[in-house]
Amino acid sequence: MFKDQLAKEVNSRRTFAIISHPDAGKTTMTEKLLLWGKAIQVAGMVKSRKSDRSATSDWMEMEKERGISITTSVMQFPYKQHTINLLDTPGHEDFSEDTYRTLTAVDSALMVIDGAKGVEERTIKLMEVCRMRDTPIISFVNKMDREIREPLELLDEIENVLNIRCVPITWPLGMGRDFAGVYNLLENKLYLYKAGFGSTITDIEVRDGYDHADVREKVGELAWASFEESLELVQMANEPLDRELFLQGKQTPVLFGTALGNFAVDHVLDAFINWAPEPKAHPAQERNVDATEEGFSGFVFKIQANMDPKHRDRIAFMRICSGKYEKGLKMNHVRIGKDVRISDALTFLAGEREHLEEAWPGDIIGLHNHGTIQIGDTFTSGEKLHFTGIPHFAPEMFRRVRLRDPLKSKQLQKGLKELSEEGATQVFMPQISNDLIVGAVGVLQFDVVAYRLKEEYKVDCIYEPISVNTVRWVHCDDEKIFNEFKKKAHDQLSVDGGGHLTYLAPSRVNLQLMQERWPDIQFRNTREH
């Protein structure tokens, strides 16, 4: 029975993203999860400048050079009778929009915290996004094999700064050179750490209880006393893990380990299998769509141009919300009202792509995009659905783009159009000139756009400053007032890459004045796709 198979496939899926501050060890963590899922045989020493093996999930050249994840990688692998869909999000702050969109496509998230630094600014921002969607969070305190802050102090900080209740599942014994392992409070078992096995999977020694003379001797009396004292405090104060509170994003299970040392990474996967939700109902404008519905539905949350320089292609990443994809499936592209037959959908392992025979709710599939698919598009078996919650944010920095070679303006327009479609930047075309203005969240984004224009479109460009402070999407229900506004504000109006009218404000004061002068006009700082 199809319904039974659908329910079984949905129950075995876990789709989650990894979020963290840059350098907390997110890419290393991603790679070790792949190692445990047997998706890769040996872990490359991630980001090691000496090593020629760069992290598996950082596949774009610029990412390899800079050592930061700029685009979202999607990876699928099996683990203990489950299918894991792992989304690695950009760790750099300039790419918050991409991260936000990724978080609309997952059912839960893994928060990686650097044990030496604690809660950092980027983590706070990402948690705000998770809170908007009540995303369940599992926390991993990383780098236990280095000198870190006191674990109790870290828990306190997570609770106070991120406003989420911590439930330690494991508790660390020692740190840095003296790191001996973790004690699992639920199982009453001690997992012993052995250094030097970071890139392979080795059997870990597990003992019942935690008080063992040889372990005590190994870590020394001081570290042992500190461990016992903090463990006692944790056991006294620890509230039990309440799955309901966890699913509401109010409580987070906390695990300790070292991704580089490949220790306790399997605890993370087990936690997702045991506690994290399977694919749930997804909100559309019309109604909530349940994962176990038989009709197919899915939405595009990301577009990536030139994933394979050999193919000069664009791939649309789609999260399946209900039903089943199979080769040759006919689906309706709701925004343009057209039926399409998809026979060449892709599955991913960070740049390695394979054609796909079937996929189920929770899975992320790639569709070849010939310029017709946009971020936020919905595909269904025929029902007119519009999935919600995938916004464009107003950029905070602006530059005018100039060509070194004026004959390449066609390539520049094509490049900027495609890069804006995939969300790498936003493009604005003022009504009073032929200028092309790019908007970004941070400086690095400009570098990425210039780099990709050069590498992928063979266009050499330079940036010039421009007196734009911020941008707002403008809308008005009263056509007469709107036309009057368009005449008066003509010099500051532009059209974005999607053809929407925007107001380019030279200063905050100017924007405030315009809002006061034109109370019937809506000045929006986000636009849904």
From Swiss-Prot:
The keyword Nucleotide-binding applies. This is Peptide chain release factor 3. HAMAP family: Rel_fac_3 (MF_00072). The keyword Mitochondrion does not apply. GTP binds at residues 20-27, 88-92, 142-145. PANTHER family: PEPTIDE CHAIN RELEASE FACTOR RF3. Increases the formation of ribosomal termination complexes and stimulates activities of RF-1 and RF-2. It binds guanine nucleotides and has strong preference for UGA stop codons. It may interact directly with the ribosome. The stimulation of RF-1 and RF-2 is significantly reduced by GTP and GDP, but not by GMP. It comes from the Bacteria. Keywords: Cytoplasm, GTP-binding, Nucleotide-binding, Protein biosynthesis. GO terms for molecular function: GTP binding; GTPase activity; guanosine tetraphosphate binding; translation release factor activity, codon nonspecific; translation release factor activity, codon specific. One of its GO terms (biological process) is regulation of translational termination. Its main location: cytoplasm. Belongs to the TRAFAC class translation factor GTPase superfamily. Classic translation factor GTPase family. PrfC subfamily. It comes from Acinetobacter baylyi (strain ATCC 33305 / BD413 / ADP1). GO terms for cellular component: cytosol. SUPFAM superfamilies: EF-G C-terminal domain-like, P-loop containing nucleoside triphosphate hydrolases, Translation proteins. It is found in: Cytoplasm.
